[in-house]
Amino acid sequence: MEHIERESMEFDVVIVGAGPSGLSAAIKIRQLAIENNLPDLSVCVVEKGSEVGAHILSGAVLEPRALNELFPNWKEEGAPLNVPVTQDKTYFLLSDSTHKEAPHWMVPKTMHNKGNYVVSLGNVVRWLGQKAEELEVSVFPGFAASEILFHEDGSVKGIQTGDMGIGKDGQPTHNFAPGYELHAKYTLFAEGCRGHLGKRLIAQYNLDKDADPQHYGIGIKELWEIDPAKHQEGLVMHGTGWPFAETGTAGGWWLYHGENNQVSLGVIADLSYDNPHVYPFMEMQRWKTHPLIKQFLEGGKRISYGARAVVKGGFNSLPKLTFPGGCLIGDDAGFLNFAKIKGSHTAMKSGMLCGEAIFEAIAAGVAQGGEVGFARVTEGDDVFIKEVTAYTQKYQNSWLKEELYNSRNFGPAMHKFGTWIGGGFNFIDQNVFRIPFTLHDLVPDFKALKTVDAVNFKPNYPKPDGKLTFDRLSSVFISNTVHEENQPSHLKLADASIPVNVNLPKWDEPAQRYCPAGVYEIVEENDGSKRFQINAANCVHCKTCDIKDPSQNITWVTPEGGGGPNYPNM
């Protein structure tokens, strides 16, 4: 395609992603700007979802610690935290029909939820978006950040939003609209787990050279409306065991009773699993047939579905947080605390810490004659420091660092020792005394997969009944996923022959199973040959393929802005 002339816009700060971390950073910067008489300091947030909250998926039980700091009067301001946790239970599923409730004293303290709230994180984020706009943050939903822009010295200059109206052949259609260049003093990347631009930045600046490999899980969620007689508002249930234990997969589940007779339920399967026959979506469907879970769902109706990879490497896997011209925040860096099964409060805190550091850097530049605002003179930007290392220092001195450090062994213990022994290790580490050493998990998730001839067990997944259990296509339908059909695939293969020639014979092409949206298929042609088919329009942007493909042959890039799921109340 020929060179395209693009319009550009200048901001002091550009933030990629309107999730908990991105919006918290934007809010903190604008709060400080107003308090310190820099009202013209401009902040822009771009969001690839059709609206703020459209791509937000979480359990969620929210710990309000960071929110208390950002908005001490959040209750009076109408934040949608309406259901305090009233009961907190943990279970071991011993088989497909039996279970055992764990005494509260046996549960690691990190998983105690007194003082927390059952929420729709999507609705919390929508509220944060409103608060950001009240502070005059420019929030642009429906604009996907597709490229990173660089200065000649290698520092980040900003981002380019994706072109609209490019056909499958890569050529402009009659609907073509070029993307914008958004330039900034500082660009913050808040894309969530496995952000495609964050991934590039980590590689380009070698930000993970001193970190353990990052680790991930796939979270699969359903929202149900249940019989009011069975609903117990504020009841929080977590558990592990069956069905994951049958394949040796580390994983767990949740079931939360929210407001309006709704329950949020789902599973998280660690992507370190080694059996190529594991099918996380069907593991969830099978899990719902357990009597402990089924009792709540019978007579109810499934109203929404979604899936998203979660980052779980924690303290040991954090990359360097800063680089010239920008920072990584939230799950783009990996701040989720898996020992709590929570990342919203940590994402928010990382954004707030970064926001403080960014504001201080801008204020220092202004004191030396630099300008702020939409109409500033960009040639004067050399008075502003390039790399805001103060963000790292603020993190090091914060409760966020302390919380992640204290939980650093949780994930590695589960991976090294399994659910039962690892669980015992974590009980001692969290409830009795701190283990005085650090465990490391140095095998990337994609390398954990064994070949089909090296495993003996193949799970049996019953056919869905359409009432309690479902297939992937009907599930994607209620995720409200929409993409422009006539656009290039956003799922890029480095080598188109690998799925059939390498992955199929070695691992029975696991993309057929690890994708929770049915994007990848092996199709048999009339002549008996096999073909790898990508149904990109089904994609719910979970990023599992980018993580788990054993050949690391699939790269997820952003499709047109506004595409993907449209999660309501998730």
Each language-model region and where it sits:
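Iron-sulfur cluster-binding cysteine motifs and their immediate structural context
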Residues: 505-537, 543-566
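C-terminal auxiliary extensions adjacent to catalytic cores
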Residues: 414-467
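FAD-binding beta-loop-beta segment adjacent to the flavin cofactor pocket
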Residues: 307-338, 475-486, 499-514, 521
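N-terminal Rossmann-like FAD-binding beta1-loop-alpha1 element of flavoenzymes
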Residues: 13-44
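Active-site-proximal substrate-binding core of FAD-dependent oxidoreductases
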Residues: 334-340, 352, 356-415, 533-535, ...
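Predominantly flavin-linked oxidoreductase catalytic cores and closely associated redox partners
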Residues: 38-39, 122, 126-127, 131-295, ...
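N-terminal FAD cofactor-binding segment of flavoenzymes
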Residues: 40-41, 46-97
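Helix-loop-beta segment of a Rossmann-like dinucleotide-binding subdomain
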Residues: 100-121, 130, 158, 268-270
